[in-house]
Amino acid sequence: MIKKHIGQALMIAGVLTTISMASTFAQNNPYQAIEGEWITLPDGREWGATSTVYYAGNGNIWVAERCGGNSNCLDTPDIDPIMLVDVDGNILKSFGKNMIVWPHGMHVDPDGNLWIADARGDEARAKGHQVHKFSADGELLMSIGTAGVAGQDKYIFNMPNDVAVAANGDIFIADGHGDDGNNRVVKYNSEGEYIMEFGKTGS
């Protein structure tokens, strides 16, 4: 008797779940997909790998694009990897040329500053393996990490892949991109001073 009641309860729960899911999927989607190339690039520039996008407010988005390919942006020193794009796909501003090797993660802090994780390094040109803070106008305000150097220390990263800034200004950097990375989270204060770290591969 108990088994019968349990079976009935499970069947009713399954039906209710199905109905709930069906009503969710039946809702109208307020968004539309854009076919073809949406962003209008300057003449002669080709679209490469898009590593990240982030909402900038007022319908605009920040886009990080790997300079027409998916490799070292320093090899194309005249191309800006960071772009601010409006709702119609027009580039409002761009910056970062000859500064970023391989843009990965992106974050906009409460003050509107843009943070970029540069997840690869170019030791010969002393760039990469850093996290950069830019103003909304593209002025470099801060860099955390040792330029072009891969490792594991308070201020040395190995493929930092993302960054987030808390409301109080504390900075959290996800350091590592794959099995060969450090795969840790490093915390700094708003001035870029080391506080602590946690996590490791497999944790």
Describe the function of each predicted region.
Residues 1-11:
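Bacterial N-terminal signal peptides that target proteins for export
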Residues 9-20:
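Bacterial N-terminal signal peptides
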Residues 25-203:
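Eukaryotic scaffold repeat domains enriched in small/polar residues
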Residues 5-6, 15, 25:
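Generic extreme N-terminus detector
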